[in-house]
Amino acid sequence: MRPHGEGHVCFIGGGTMGCYNALLAALAGYDAVVYDIAWDSLLEVPQRVSEIAGEMAIAGLISPKAAQDASLRIAIQKDLKAALYGAGLVSESIFENLAVKRELFAELERYAASDTILTTNSSSLLVSDIEDAVIDGSRFAALHSHLGAMLFDIVPGPRTSPATLSRLQDYVQHLGGVSLVLKKENKGYVFNAMIGPVLAAAMLQVIDGAASIEEVDRAWMKRTGSPMGPFGMMDLFGTRLIYDSWKNRPAMPEQPLMDLMRRKVLSFLAPVVGTGRFGMRSGRGFYTYPAPAYAAPDFLQAHPESSLADYALTSAWTQNAVLIATNDVARPHDVDRAWIAATRQAKGPFAILDEIGLDRALTLFHVTGPLAGPENAGKVHKCLIDQLAQGRSGLQVGKGFYEYPDPAYAAVTFLSGSVI
């Protein structure tokens, strides 16, 4: 899709994600129309867009002039037929209710032109949950964005056409983003399927008294080179969002350990959210803003990090990365590409495994405990054993998941490489 070449882009849902995606489209030169069934929500769209643009400008991602110009290309519309008229692409970001989404997509198909691409930005529902609600599945797919990052997961359904995938990849390229076409659908896509377990491991370290918030974040920042740790990230995402994501998970009495973890996390987060500590936007979360402790020049040197926290977080991160690859959702290099695009870090989990050494990683997994379920643990173990059997134990021997001394992830073209 080209700016001004295939009509405007229609965004269904005037919440944060709808506004963020509309802003990205407008910044790339597209005309964007935001539709919402609630007039009150639509009236708040300009303010939401302005706040998001302001944060991007402060971060140095866009200029104030670009933000101002983009805002002029974003319109609001209460009438669905009018919003869809002339649209080349539709992106849905309404609340996560399957029945409502299915009804919406049936309606979108009735009113949109026959060549309009219909996409969902759902974070928790799968393509297979929704795609049969439309008659023409060739033009339906998931196009999943990440707030604050230029990573876009593209997930085709069984009927999605190659032409639709190509147009979506072109669209992401015009946005200046990185597209990751998943081989098959996966709960949490790729990045979220890794970051979720990392955040859970971080909270459990503090809940169980193994480390402090600062020790956990310091360990992660030293391991990954990230400018913030898991608790800083939760402040960035918003603590209410994290709390709601755990609250909306169904109870799992058949899995007592997972159910216990859910209850522990909710009890930990409840007083944070209950006292209005919503994160960066509210000025206070796990840290106080605009000058959080982790941003201090001496944060990494002032105190030692927790090695136990380092082991727990690294294990959760890398084991889930391996599981994504072994489940044939995405290749190891594409898993790393997703991580690097989303976090702006220099290395992804498979590069870190090479750095640790695959033999040592196996020991680490044994010490910290495997992923839930023997089947998953077996998959992770087999993947690393197979690599070791080929003499690919990591950086120290010059080959692991990458070839050294010039690993693919260090190339300037890595993020724009093949994603299929």
What do these predicted ranges mean?
Residues 1-420:
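N-terminal glycine-rich phosphate-binding loop for ADP-containing cofactors
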